[in-house]
Structure formats: C-alpha cells, structure tokens
Amino acid sequence: MQNNQFPHFSDEVGDRNMHNPYASGSSYDALFPPCAKLPYHGVELQPSAVCPKNFVIFDQTYDRSQVMYHPELTHKLMNTPSLNNLASTFQNEYVGGSYGNYGNYEQEVSSSYQEDPNEIDALLSADEDYEENDDNEGEEDGGDSEEVSTARTSSRDYGNTTAESCCSSYGYNNNNNNNSRKQSLSGSASSSNNDGKGRKKMKKMMGVLRRIVPGGEQMNTACVLDEAVQYLKSLKIEAQKLGVGHFSNQS
C-alpha cells in the first residue's frame, strides 16, 4: 500500500518554475474571466497543479504573503465571499500586525528599561568628592571606621580576583579617570534639594563600601561596586564551609 505524502511545490522540485519571479496580476489572465476582479489586497494568488484539490494554503514570509491552490478551484474561490474576508483578516492581523508593529515593539521594550540619570550622576560624582569628604566622614563616624575596616587588606585575594586585577580589568587609571570624570561632570550638578540629598546618600554609601571592601580606598566607584559583589560571594562561600546558616544559591 502506497503511503500518502504531501506533494512538493513548484519551488521545491527544481523544475523550470523554480527561479521564476513571483506571480503578478498578469499571470492570471488565462485563469480568470476578463470581468473578474481580484478581491485580495496585499496577498498574492498562486495557483499550482501540484497543490491538492481539497486544500487552500495560506503562506506567509517576511516580505510577502500568498494563497496557493489547485487551478480547478479558481472559479469556486472567486464565488466565495468568505475567502475574501479570510484573506483580508490574514493580511491585516498577521502580515501588518507581525511585521508592521515590530519597530514599535522594540521601542516599547527599550523605553521600559530606562535608567535614572540622577542615580547615575550620583554614582559618578562619588569619585569626584570622595577625597574632599573623606576626613569629614571619618569625624562623623566617631572612630567607627576603624571597626568597619578591620577586614581590609589590599593584598587579599578572594574568588581569584584582587583589587589590582579588578581595576586593570576595567582599564581604569585612578588619576586620569578622576580628571576626565571631573571634566565630564562639571556642568551636570543638580540644583534641586532632592538631587542633593540623593547625592549625599550615595556618597555616604560608597564611603562605607570603600571601608568594607579590601583595598576599596584605592579604587574608583565601578571597581568598588564590583569588588563588593565578589567580596560578598567569598564571604558566603567561607560561611558555607564553616556550616554557618543556610544560604540559597542567589547572588
């Protein structure tokens, strides 16, 4: 018993129609009567003898859409108003909707991930004002900085990452980086009270991180943040080795 298989279309069997251009309206003059008008807009009609007689195939690609059918179904299709509605729906919802709104979708996604420029400015300005406010912060802490910084050592190696390797991996030079950052941020200071409070809070947080992270006082903001993450991971591993607490695999 012979197995029923789907027939190959003309662009798959390698015949003379394989490299022909897509059919246009003039290709159907021999199939449709002179008074017949094609009811489809934006969808190409593709009659083919290799199509099954009981199938009407809607094919959609990136740049075109077509309806393929057996030539004997031509007159039946022309007398079927519901097919016209189906083709219009296919064109509007799938062709226009899928590809016409692709750019709008990208724009919506990108707009949902916008960063707060005030927070970025506060982080960038932490390096600029760190040296000026370091002495004042030490006096306000009342000696607490000595207790916080007991674990600090510039030569400590954790997670195969040292303070020197962190700064070198970012390609930063502290002196050149501070000078260039001062120039880029000279006109970006905010005059509002809310921005001033946010900058002060951010600088205080970075000051604490610099005292906690080994070698943090010799790093810029980006290196301090990266080293803080690595340092916390190393502390988590050490605590797990000692059997202290129950930690989940979250970082």
From Swiss-Prot:
Domain bHLH: 186-235
Record's keyword annotation contains DNA-binding: yes
InterPro entries named in the record: bHLH_dom, HLH_DNA-bd_sf, SAC51-like
One function term, GO molecular function aspect: protein dimerization activity
Family annotation (PROSITE patterns): BHLH (PS50888)
GO cellular component, one term: nucleus
Polar residues composition-biased segments: 148-161
UniProt key word DNA-binding: yes
Alphabetical UniProt keywords: DNA-binding, Nucleus, Transcription, Transcription regulation
Region (Disordered) location: 1-20, 130-161, 173-202
Acidic residues: compositionally biased ranges: 130-147
An annotated GO BP: regulation of DNA-templated transcription
Low complexity: bias regions: 173-192
Coiled coil (UniProt feature): none
Biased composition regions of type Basic and acidic residues, renumbered to the chain: 9-18
Subcellular location: Nucleus
Subunit structure: Homodimer. Interacts with LHW.
Protein name, per record: Transcription factor bHLH144
Organism whose genome encodes this protein: Arabidopsis thaliana (Mouse-ear cress)
